[in-house]
Amino acid sequence: MVNYKEKLDEAIHLTQQKGFEQTRAEWLMLDVFQWTRTDFVVHMHDDMPKAMIMKFDLALQRMLLGEPIQYIVGFASFYGRTFDVNSNCLIPRPETEEVMLHFLQQLEDDATIVDIGTGSGVLAITLKCEKPDLNVIATDISLEAMNMARNNAEKHQSQIQFLTGDALKPLINEGIKLNGLISNPPYIDEKDMVTMSPTVTRFEPHQALFADNHGYAIYESIIEDLPHVMEKGSPVVFEIGYNQGEALKSIILNKFPDKKIDIIKDINGHDRIVSFKW
């Protein structure tokens, strides 16, 4: 028999052989068994049942091939909550929590807002959970991502209006007016794929990562349609790549020269947010 500590030591050895940090093996064990670190300490010398060994070994093999842990275990954390994820939607990043907070702080309690390109729904659902009186709309072009977002909304008992379609087009068709817009759209230039981690490019959905026109195509589509949906004085907040702030600011000002555009850095000192009032 093997205990949990011995199995983890074996996993750490294999993980390091593949060039990954040992913390990946540690997090995998905690997430596969949905344990805290305290749970592991309590059970580390317990013999592992055969079913648990098989379950962990299968997960470990997937991780050693580079698959993200969140896809293996089927969930990810965002702003203290757990959301179901799969390979049809991006894994939420910690930096996106900063984007969400910047937007949240600008909203009236009963505002009507939209999350464009909702993916797994983490932004829309978190905003609704934090301010329950918000009227939250979420859009995505991917039916598979929208199904995941709906499941997450049900899990968190969040009433969200989901509209499938391209950027703001579904809202224009419905005649909806907004008191706020947030979007973390696809914004990576295809040519940058060669510099990215294979864990991202092999497993996360390309449609949610990459955009035409050097990564700006979705931003441009949203910006073009803002006059049709935004109420005066309402916040517009975009998550951006680390080197996109000035270029996106120029795109906005070329279209709407009277706007005051803020470029805000994340906790790591990288440009992360473009924000302005409509």
UniProtKB/Swiss-Prot annotation:
What Enzyme Commission number(s) apply to this enzyme?
A: 2.1.1.297
Q: Which reaction does it catalyse?
A: L-glutaminyl-[peptide chain release factor] + S-adenosyl-L-methionine = N(5)-methyl-L-glutaminyl-[peptide chain release factor] + S-adenosyl-L-homocysteine + H(+)
Gene3D superfamilies from the entry?
Answer: DNA helicase RuvA subunit, C-terminal domain (1.10.8.10), Vaccinia Virus protein VP39 (3.40.50.150)
* MF terms in GO: nucleic acid binding; protein-(glutamine-N5) methyltransferase activity; protein-glutamine N-methyltransferase activity
Its top-level enzyme class, in one word, is: transferase
Q: Which GO terms describe its biological process?
A: methylation; translational termination
Q: Which sequence ranges form a coiled-coil region, renumbered to this chain?
A: none
- Name the keywords, alphabetized: Methyltransferase, S-adenosyl-L-methionine, Transferase
At the top level, the lineage of the source is: Bacteria
Residues annotated for S-adenosyl-L-methionine binding in this entry: 117-121, 140, 184
Q: What InterPro entries does UniProt report for this protein, alphabetically?
A: DNA_methylase_N6_adenine_CS, HemK-like, N5-glutamine_MTase, PrmC_N, RF_methyltr_PrmC, SAM-dependent_MTases_sf, Small_mtfrase_dom
Q: Which family does it belong to?
A: Belongs to the protein N5-glutamine methyltransferase family. PrmC subfamily.
Q: NCBIfam families, alphabetically?
A: hemK_fam, RF_mod_PrmC
- What is the name attached to this protein's record? Release factor glutamine methyltransferase
User: What organism is this sequence from?
Assistant: Staphylococcus aureus (strain NCTC 8325 / PS 47)
Q: Which gene encodes it?
A: prmC
